[in-house]
Amino acid sequence: MIDWLVIWGVTQGVGFVFKPILEDLAKDAAKDYIKDFFKTSLGNVIKDLINKEPLQKAIGKAIKEFLELVQQELEDEDLDENQLKKYILPFKKLLKNESVRQTLGSAFDSNTKLVNINIVADIAKEVVPTLPPDFNWSRVAKRYGKKVQAIRMNSDELRKILDSENLDKLVNQNYEIRPEFDLEKYQESIQEQYGNLKLEKI
């Protein structure tokens, strides 16, 4: 059984107040998020993908980064732990919104330089209690974009899925994402290791 919280790096975060949100997300391995999160970059191809695990890994990591940035903004306003905990349920509700998921997921699109955080901010006004006056959504968006690009760059599997040239192959059940195999290097290593064997004596 996959421990999604470990994969997403949640267990490493000391003092991470939004951990309960990720614990709920881990119950269905973020499957409920996939369609909305990657709608911009993958569209209808998602339903045909056989191996969705790289997407599940990326979603959890991205949401963790987003919530950590939100917590950082709140802590900069000198909110104590009890005050921070009041934001858990509202932000959990915020992340259930389809438009919010699509906006956060759009950061995985290579053509997206900066997510349209105004969409998230406007919806947050309806579901999140009054945020501190200096809470900066633009700063969250900028930092979040960099975090997501790092997630993308650090996952070969994810990059191959998001590469549009691979989509047709990935929907084929006979195709699996595999590490690149260097045939020439393999041949050289075989020759070095066994080149001196005198096979005629065997």
Each language-model region and where it sits:
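Structure-specific endonuclease nuclease cores
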Residues: 1-202
